[in-house]
């Protein structure tokens, strides 16, 4: 095999994928080269950034696109609407910072102390200015990602075999963190309101706490339901955790994406010192600026004893380019880029909610208060096409050694086959996720319209059969 095989394959995917996408989003779509040129002018007239031009991610080992092609087959997926990262060209301030550092062609060890000081200055200023949270240097630790930070914290507070509280449906990655920390899940269902939104069930939460419960992973804004938890919600849940000596691990990675008229309340901002001291907050630039592959995050706490316990379990081997990318992100230009993106995403969630509820038969959703993720209830449609029977039939006849599939995975396959759109199957988000799919709208409006129109065509065709 040629040593250039991988590069050739990626080049093919880039050209084929982008040509297909641009050809589908509207008449007169530019060629690949023209699209790249258009994308280069990221900030145009009036200081506005261009989020409308689809940006090619095919052939870059993207989980959202290339992994789905690997799983479902070449040409199977036209639009990836699953994994939680954004499709936009990076903020120019990030790209410039990375290009400048690449000009210095040496990649030796980085001074971790100096790097942490730089990251702290940017992050603490950002959190104080935008969210009113003051972070002291002694309260702040840089890590290689929210997952490594959570795993170290779980190992510090939850002995092997003990339980960790999760309010479900919740981010599926938490279950991997529990596996890595040798702990067990304790799902607590969120209440479902009449309009399809969700609320905390405080009585059920407290009843689930036992002598083996040491930690609770809070997701705020909540992935995948889109809740921005109120101060009252957080105070009540914080009181329960403090009463039962359950440590709060607050994952607030989606906090920069909040819909108009909604509010994100940091757990660290609560007006009760004892509750705040019983918590650790985890954040990163990865969701806000599309930096997941750069592997840099941080956590902080007002409780020195908690941090000392975590440090014993934690080691962060960080990389130079992750640091540089974050410096470019947390700049005045980066902040303006993000402000415009948040407004753009808010328009996407409004558009998508209206479209789903009016044009996708048998599917319901609601506009999220935060995140760029939407939680789609396919119950009526899934029961109509018989996904439970599909799963039972498949599992009865599947090849030996192959894993069993859930009804949500059968729906995932059905949508790929009939709409060429990939959504995340709901079964992995914990209890209360039956017949649900997660959709990411962190993409160009044209790409979003393509995905939704594909879904509408497929679902209406199936419904009329």
Where are the model-predicted features located?
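N-terminal secretory signal peptides and thylakoid transit peptides that target proteins
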Residues: 1-21
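N-terminal small-domain helix-loop-helix segment of the aminotransferase-like
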Residues: 44-145, 152, 330-332, 462-465
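Conserved PLP-anchoring active-site segment centered on the Schiff-base-forming lysine
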Residues: 156-178
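Helix C-cap/helix->beta junction micro-motif
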Residues: 181, 243-244, 419
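Active-site phosphate-binding strand-loop segment of PLP-dependent enzymes
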Residues: 192-262
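PLP-dependent aminotransferase class I/II
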Residues: 278-358, 363-370
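Conserved glycine-rich beta-strand-loop-beta hairpin in the small C-terminal domain of fold type I
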Residues: 344-353, 365-381, 387-396, 433
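PLP-dependent enzyme catalytic core of the Aspartate aminotransferase-like
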Residues: 391-398, 402-465
């Amino acid at each position: 095999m040629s040593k250039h095989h991988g590069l050739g394959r990626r080049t093919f995917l880039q050209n084929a994928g982008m040509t297909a996408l641009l050809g589908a989003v509207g008449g007169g779509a530019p060629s690949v080269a023209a699209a790249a040129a258009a994308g280069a002018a990221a900030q145009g007239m009036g200081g506005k950034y261009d989020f409308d031009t689809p940006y090619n991610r095919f052939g870059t080992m993207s989980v959202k696109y290339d992994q789905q092609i690997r799983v479902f087959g070449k040409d199977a997926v036209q639009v990836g609407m699953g994994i939680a990262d954004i499709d936009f060209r990076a903020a120019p301030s990030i790209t410039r910072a990375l290009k400048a550092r690449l000009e210095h062609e040496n990649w030796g060890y980085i001074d971790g102390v100096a790097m942490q000081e730089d990251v702290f200055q940017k992050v603490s200023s950002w959190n104080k200015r935008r969210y009113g949270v003051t972070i002291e240097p002694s309260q702040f630790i840089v890590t290689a990602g929210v997952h490594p930070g959570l795993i170290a914290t779980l190992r510090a507070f939850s002995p092997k075999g003990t339980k960790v509280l999760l309010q479900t449906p919740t981010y599926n990655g938490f279950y991997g963190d529990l596996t890595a920390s040798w702990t067990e899940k304790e799902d607590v269902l969120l209440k479902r309101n009449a309009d399809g939104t969700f609320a905390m069930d405080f009585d059920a939460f407290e009843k689930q706490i036992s002598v083996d419960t040491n930690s609770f992973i809070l997701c705020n804004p909540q992935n995948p339901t889109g809740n921005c938890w109120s101060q009252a919600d957080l105070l009540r849940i914080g009181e329960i955790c403090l009463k039962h000596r359950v440590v709060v691990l607050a994952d607030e990675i989606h906090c920069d994406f909040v819909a108009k008229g909604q509010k994100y309340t940091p757990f660290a901002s609560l007006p009760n010192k004892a509750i705040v001291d019983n918590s650790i907050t985890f954040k990163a630039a990865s969701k806000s600026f599309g930096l997941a592959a750069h592997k840099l995050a941080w956590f902080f706490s007002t409780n020195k004893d908690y941090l000392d316990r975590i440090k014993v379990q934690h080691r962060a081997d960080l990389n130079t380019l992750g640091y540089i990318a974050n410096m470019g992100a947390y700049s005045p230009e980066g902040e303006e880029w993000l402000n415009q993106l948040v407004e753009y995403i808010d328009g996407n969630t409004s558009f998508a909610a209206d479209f789903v509820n009016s044009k996708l038969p048998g599917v319901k959703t609601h506009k999220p208060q935060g995140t760029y993720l939407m939680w789609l209830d396919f119950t009526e449609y899934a029961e109509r096409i018989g996904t439970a029977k599909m799963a039972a039939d498949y599992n009865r006849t599947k090849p030996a050694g192959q894993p069993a599939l859930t009804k949500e995975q059968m729906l995932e396959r059905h949508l790929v086959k009939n709409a060429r759109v990939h959504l995340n199957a709901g079964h992995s988000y914990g209890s209360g996720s039956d017949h649900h799919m997660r959709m990411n709208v962190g993409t160009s409006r044209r790409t979003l319209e393509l995905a939704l129109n594909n879904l509408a065509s497929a679902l209406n065709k199936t419904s009329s059969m």
